[in-house]
Each structure stands twice: as structure tokens, then as C-alpha cells.
Amino acid sequence: MTESEVLAKLAAQALDEKKGIDVQILDMRNLQSAPAAFFVIASGNVPSHVSALSDHVHEVVKKATGLNPSKVEGYMNAEWILMDYFDVVVHIFLQPKREFYRLEQLWEDAERMR
């Protein structure tokens, strides 16, 4: 298992621990135009849940690996938080935003790991 795969699974586990909704891991490694090796995608019920999910992913990944995300976007409005760990990008949405952007359909050729 690669370091990136371990990180993706760790992020998904952290999202599960805080009741993230419909947590998925997309393996993008076989896609030519993919911006990362893995996407981890989840939803929260309300903005405070989305923020709490992001905080927990950050805490769990930092404790286990020592890594901080290179960039975090969307934290202030907490409708779609993107956490960039280079080869792993974590997307945490409010459900309506997830339904609107449909990342799983956009990257439908990616292998679903869960």
C-alpha cells in the first residue's frame, strides 16, 4: 500500500468517526488528467458539521503522519472545504453543494475504493 493510499484511508476513517455522510475514496491513479492520486469525498449536514469534519481530518492526519495540508479552501463558509495533501485531496461538502458539483460523476472513470 502506498503512502498516498494510507493517507486516503486515514482521512476516510476520520470522516467516518465524525459521522461524515457517504464517504467515498476515488482512486485516480489510472486517469491521465487527474489532479491527484486520490479524492476523498464526504458530506456534512450543516456548515458546523462540515467544519468539524475538516478539523478532525486535519487532527487525525497530523497525529498519524505529521502532515498538514498544503492548502485548505472554503473553510470560512463551510459549504465545500477542500484539503490538499498533494496526492490526496479531501472534499467535504454540504449535501446540496455535493449534488450540484457531482464530483463522483465528473470522475466516473476513477476506481471506487469504498
Which ranges hold each PLM region?
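Polybasic/polar functional segments that serve as interface/processing modules
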Residues: 1-35, 43-81, 95-97, 103-114
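Active-site beta-strand termini and strand-to-loop segments that position acidic
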Residues: 83-85
